[in-house]
């Protein structure tokens, strides 16, 4: 805590308001609200905190505060400040997505469309739906039952949908506005769950079609009835009153909060929204902040009712949402809130279980590996692999794992400089010497374990360099592969022995990931180098084509094949002189050049013969 913060803490009032934490760059990193600014802000700089709060406090260099008249005013101000500044430590919704709605437009001849924007334009909106796929599924069903206008064709024309019975083409059929308004009401009833009338009508049409031997049409009606039934089963009935409501529940544990929102539309649970985040204040206060952001950030249709848990300030939510706010005490609505709370608890438990498994895969694996090899826990592991084809473009690569996870910023590539031909042992000797000679010279952090992708020979070479030449004391292990090129055995010790390692253990899976990663990194580098060398060698020896022009050609055409296929004019456009461009084509396409020369010679011979035969 610096002197500026100490001085400001003495000046804090006991009023409600918002406080704004800033980092060394003056950037707002956290916005909070408080019933008592003095107590809340001082609490950040006193006593011990959990890890996430310690991380926040470590970055605070300055703070500001704004006094408000009430707690609710502080809540509204906090939400606006978060929206405006997007502080990195605040609750931020996972994304800014808006949910799709089905809309019946308020036009003379209504249309049925999908939209993500709810406007006060007289249209009828139904939703939100969990995703556009779900909305499209329902709209496709409605299109087959209700032939709304779909086109904007002139009066003399009809659209494709007219021919398949999904557009009434009002300009041709002369249907009046009342017909379409009536159909809009039927759709509204259908989407509210009152679909028995539609099903009865479809059953009647199916029976009539069957009686007149129109079996294909009868089958279409049957499919529609089945589709409605399928839709019914997907939308579980949660309430008998067919109301639209959002149901909130939350659960907290280990400094984290999960909020779940159930979207109940026309009495059916159609989707839920789940968010997990660390909280820094009282849980009920951060829950209110979340609710405010939820309705402010999303293009969200405010429902008839919002159901909230018992411990939440009802008046505060009313200030955030223009809807009927209920804290149900019993019955069906109470069960809905309890269900949301239960799901929030389950989601949070799943997060911690996954986190434990992740720790087991990484931290647990390196601890077990250390015990198995009887060395200190190998926090930093460096692994090496060589790659070459018949000794051409030999390379080596090093990958680094820290705390059981790849540390890609520490990866290194090596071109083999002192070895001629395919000599894997000599290549390993060179790379180990270069890497750990540099570690010594520059006092770099040495690894806790070196893993060589290879057998006894490669490991012994690495040991000679590390222990005898450089005098370093770093444990070295080898990973041998089987004939299927899969991780097979771990070699360790002096003399080297096969370590008894369970293939189902997390430490085995860690070594497998390390071996796969170093192999991938080495072979990718080798391919890049081989491709580059191939490109350079084929363009070497062309007068006027230096490294810069070669680079420009590669940057423009991306590959040697495309340069071969390019015309002289296309090569000239890259900034290569015409004579040089012609030389490039001659070098890359010798057969075509030879054919052209042959044709030119034949043409000259023919013209010469013709001149000799003239009188």
Curated annotation (Swiss-Prot):
Residues 14-91 form the GIY-YIG domain. Its main location: cytoplasm. Residues 196-231 form the UVR domain. It is found in: Cytoplasm. GO terms for molecular function: DNA binding; excinuclease ABC activity. Transmembrane segments: none annotated. One of its GO terms (cellular component) is excinuclease repair complex. GO terms for biological process: nucleotide-excision repair; SOS response. It comes from the Bacteria. Keywords: Cytoplasm, DNA damage, DNA excision, DNA repair, Excision nuclease, SOS response. The UvrABC repair system catalyzes the recognition and processing of DNA lesions. UvrC both incises the 5' and 3' sides of the lesion. The N-terminal half is responsible for the 3' incision and the C-terminal half is responsible for the 5' incision. Belongs to the UvrC family. PANTHER family: UVRABC SYSTEM PROTEIN C, UVRC/OXIDOREDUCTASE. This is UvrABC system protein C. It comes from Streptococcus pneumoniae serotype 19F (strain G54). The gene is uvrC.
């Amino acid at each position: 805590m610096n002197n500026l913060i100490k001085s400001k803490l003495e000046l804090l009032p006991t009023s409600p308001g918002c406080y704004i934490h800033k980092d060394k760059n003056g950037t707002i990193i956290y916005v909070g609200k408080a019933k008592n600014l003095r107590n809340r802000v001082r609490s950040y700089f006193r006593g011990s905190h959990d890890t996430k709060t310690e991380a926040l406090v470590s970055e605070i260099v300055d703070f500001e505060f704004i006094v408000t008249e009430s707690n609710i005013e502080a809540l509204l101000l906090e939400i606006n400040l978060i929206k405006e500044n997007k502080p990195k430590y605040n609750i931020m919704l996972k994304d800014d997505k808006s949910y799709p709605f089905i809309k019946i437009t308020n036009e003379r001849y209504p249309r049925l469309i999908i939209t993500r924007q709810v406007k006060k334009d007289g249209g009828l909106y139904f939703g939100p739906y969990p995703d556009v796929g779900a909305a499209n599924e329902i709209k496709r069903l409605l299109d087959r039952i209700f032939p709304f206008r779909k086109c904007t064709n002139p009066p003399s024309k009809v659209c494709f949908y007219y021919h398949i019975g999904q557009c009434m083409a009002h300009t041709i059929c002369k249907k009046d506005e009342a017909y379409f308004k009536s159909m809009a009401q039927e759709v509204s009833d259908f989407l509210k769950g009152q679909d028995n009338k539609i099903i009865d009508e479809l059953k009647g049409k199916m029976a009539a079609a069957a009686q007149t031997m129109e079996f294909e049409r009868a089958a279409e009606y049957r499919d529609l009835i089945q589709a409605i039934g399928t839709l019914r089963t997907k939308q579980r009935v949660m309430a008998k009153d067919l109301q639209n409501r959002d149901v909130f529940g939350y659960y907290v544990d280990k400094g984290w909060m999960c909020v779940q929102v159930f979207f109940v539309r026309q009495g059916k649970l159609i989707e839920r929204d789940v968010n997990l985040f660390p909280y820094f204040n009282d849980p009920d206060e951060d829950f209110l902040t979340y609710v405010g952001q939820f309705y402010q950030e999303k293009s969200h249709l405010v429902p008839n009712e919002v159901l909230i848990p018992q411990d939440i300030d009802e008046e505060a939510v009313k200030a955030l949402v223009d809807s009927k706010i209920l804290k149900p005490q019993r019955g069906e609505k109470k069960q809905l809130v309890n269900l949301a709370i239960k799901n929030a608890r389950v989601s949070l438990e799943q997060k911690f279980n996954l986190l434990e498994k992740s720790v087991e895969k990484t931290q647990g694996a390196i601890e077990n590996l250390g015990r198995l090899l009887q060395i200190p826990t190998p926090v930093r592991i460096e692994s090496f692999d060589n790659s070459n084809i018949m000794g051409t473009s030999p390379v080596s690569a090093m990958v680094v794992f820290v705390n059981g996870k790849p540390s890609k910023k520490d990866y290194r590539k090596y071109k083999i400089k002192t070895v001629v031909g395919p000599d894997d042992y000599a290549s390993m000797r060179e790379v180990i010497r270069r890497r750990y000679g540099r570690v010594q010279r520059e006092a770099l952090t040495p690894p806790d374990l070196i893993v060589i992708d290879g057998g006894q020979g490669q490991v012994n070479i690495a040991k000679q360099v590390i222990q005898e030449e450089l005098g370093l004391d770093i444990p070295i292990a080898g990973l041998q592969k089987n004939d299927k090129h899969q991780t097979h055995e771990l070699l360790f010790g002096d003399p080297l022995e096969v370590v008894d390692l369970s293939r189902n253990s997390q430490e085995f899976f860690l070594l497998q990931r390390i071996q796969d990663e170093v192999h991938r990194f080495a072979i990718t580098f080798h391919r890049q180098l081989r491709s580059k060398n191939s490109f350079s060698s084929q363009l070497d020896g062309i007068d006027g084509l230096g490294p810069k022009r070669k680079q420009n050609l590669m940057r423009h055409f991306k590959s040697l094949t495309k340069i071969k296929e390019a015309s002289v004019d296309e090569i000239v456009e890259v900034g290569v002189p015409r004579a040089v461009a012609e030389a490039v084509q001659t070098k890359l396409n010798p057969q075509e050049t030879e054919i052209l020369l042959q044709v030119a010679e034949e043409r000259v011979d023919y013209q010469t013969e013709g001149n000799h035969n003239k009188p």
